[in-house]
Amino acid sequence: MLTPQSNTTLEEIARFIEAHDTFAICGHVNPDGDCLGAGLALEHGLRALGKQVVGLLATEDPVEEKLGFLPGLENLVPAKDFTDEVEVFIAIDVPNVDRLKDAAAVHDRAKHHITIDHHASETSMAELNYVDPASASASDLAWELLKLLNATGKDQALCALTGIMTDTGRFSYQNVNPTCFIHAAETVEAGAEPNLIAREFFQSRSLPSLRLEQLMLSRMMFFCGGAFVCSYLKDTDFEKQGAIRDDAEILIDILRGIAGVRVALILKENGKGEIRGSLRAKDETDVAQIARDFGGGGHKAAAGLIYHKSLADALIEVPTDVIETCFPEDAEAEVERLCILIRSLREELDD
């Protein structure tokens, strides 16, 4: 199928892969379960076809520990350490070159480029560009491609099912569609174990993560009649609780799960002088447009951004955008209340 944002089909990409020998595969910076699952599924599949394949990480940052069960994860190479030439660079779950970070240099050296993604994007970075925003996950697309290549297998199935389960919130988010259930069934038939994914990823929270949750809940700020909730974490929170950044990944979904909330936002200092923002929507509200206002992006119901000023500034500017965009009828009064509240927290935020 040729989607509106594509210039090719998965069938054509399969034929192109069959005609080439050396590949590099990379996903976006701060890779999540879908990004890693899709990339590793493709890596295992192409290697089963006799191809020479290297899986890359966009930066040297460690990946989420809870994904350590994924086969082949330990062999991923930080892109800055990879200096060889490859014929084909496959970008998976990446809407633009900026999100490749260090891997952009490998992308530029490659002779040919393929993009496989489910993020809507206004730009294209590949000669073969397949983008399907209707797909629940990049792993759904990777699995479809592997079927076309006749390159499915147990490892591929586990990686793909991990991506599908994590990006759909165990089949509970708005992006769920009939196809992801079909693919899930196929991966289980191929040897994937849903209980393994559930145990290792969804049922293995650390004590530091729970302590961060306590802090986040104590700082919740509700606006627009409880339809918008915002909270934050500071660098010192991670230090004092002995937590790593991955320990905070689940927290945005806890905010989203509060009764009456339509939009949730958490802002976290990332240890690099930046603020990482995560946005979630529980209805048809489009939070991706808010993320794009700050140079980020994502999906309609789940998006992220990086903010380059102080946490105090972020706690005014980003929630203001949310209120004005999603709740215009309440904007003037609620933005004024927000500004008063954040001014009262200045000393704590600057500490």
Give names to the regions the model predicted.
Residues L70-G72, R109, M125-A126, F294:
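Short, structured coil segments at secondary-structure junctions
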Residues A38, G68, D102-A105, E127-L128, ...:
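Short amphipathic alpha-helical segments
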Residues L2-V29, G37-E65, T83-V88, G169-D351:
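Hydrophobic helix-and-loop "lid/oligomerization" segment in the mid-to-C-terminal part
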Residues P4, E74-A79, Y130-A134:
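Short acidic-hydrophobic, aromatic-tinged amphipathic segments that line or gate anion-handling sites
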Residues P62-V63, G68-P78:
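Glycine-rich oxoanion-binding loops at beta->alpha junctions
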Residues I116-H183:
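Short alpha-helices
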Residues N30-P31, V94-V97, H119-S121, D235-T236, ...:
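Short glycine-rich anion-binding loops that position phosphate/pyrophosphate groups of nucleotides
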Residues P78-L128:
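Active-site cofactor/cluster-binding pocket
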